[in-house]
Swiss-Prot record:
Gene Ontology molecular functions: nickel cation binding
Name of protein: Urease accessory protein UreD 1
InterPro entries according to UniProt: UreD
Superkingdom of origin organism: Bacteria
HAMAP family assigned to the protein according to its UniProt record, in alphabetical order: UreD
Keyword set, alphabetical order: Chaperone, Cytoplasm, Nickel insertion
Recorded name of the encoding gene: ureD1
Organism: Bradyrhizobium sp. (strain ORS 278)
Subunit structure of this chain's protein: UreD, UreF and UreG form a complex that acts as a GTP-hydrolysis-dependent molecular chaperone, activating the urease apoprotein by helping to assemble the nickel containing metallocenter of UreC. The UreE protein probably delivers the nickel.
Keyword Ion transport: no
Protein family (similarity comment): Belongs to the UreD family.
Subcellular location per the Swiss-Prot or TrEMBL entry: Cytoplasm
Role: Required for maturation of urease via the functional incorporation of the urease nickel metallocenter.
Amino acid sequence: MRADPASAAADIFEANRARGAVRFDLRLQDGVTRRHHLHESGSLRVRFPSPEDDGLSAMFVNTAGGIAGGDRFAIEVAAGEGSRVTLSSAAAEKVYRAPGTPAELAIALRAADSAHISWLPQETILFDRARIHRRMDIDLAETASLLLCEIVVFGRTAMGERMREGEFVDRWRLRRGGKLVFAETVRLDGDIGDKLAQPAIANGATAIGTALIVPGDGALVERIRESLPASRGEAGLSAWNGFAMARFCAQDAASLRADMMAVLGCASAVPLPRLWLN
């Protein structure tokens, strides 16, 4: 009996896809945040650099060297009562062109009472024809706090690449005290470069970013606005439902990163990861 060529090709494709998962939780012991129940699998790893002054630092490493179509990665972090952690990435994450099957990335963050999570990865760069579905689920206790940022760059701007085809789906859900306080799904597909050129979407920007600050209110927004220098790109801030949000867009990752760092510096006393400052 001869094997079905289409089925054989699908099996080969699946066998060559990267898989990776990291799960760990944190506990406050004798006033020090310590990791607990660490699990790693596949090509996703986590490293814990030298202790920072405030809580624990964790850095994710994708040993596959990037994300391609059909890859699947998952990150789960639970911060126990009173613990503090800053989560970052070793480098900008590259998402390569995909023939059809999108990559999948699932992130779940949980923080108990009085715990704090800073989610501060470096930017994600989508190559032309890249396809990725990302899901971010955040569950905070009423007295927990969060500082989160994400930067996405469409196309390799340094070499003049334009994203003429691709798919980007980004689903965020934020719960606080068991209540859903923020839900958003961003979907861009087809000629993404053409869509970003439209004035009502990004007005030609190729890098976009979002920062979430919990808790946050109008007073925090005004304090950030008064302290900020002139932005290199465009930025907007608002607050509702007990959290503050900043949106960014710029012509390149460096400009957006500078604007993001300025906002994060005003919004929180939590130091940025050292890799952000290199």
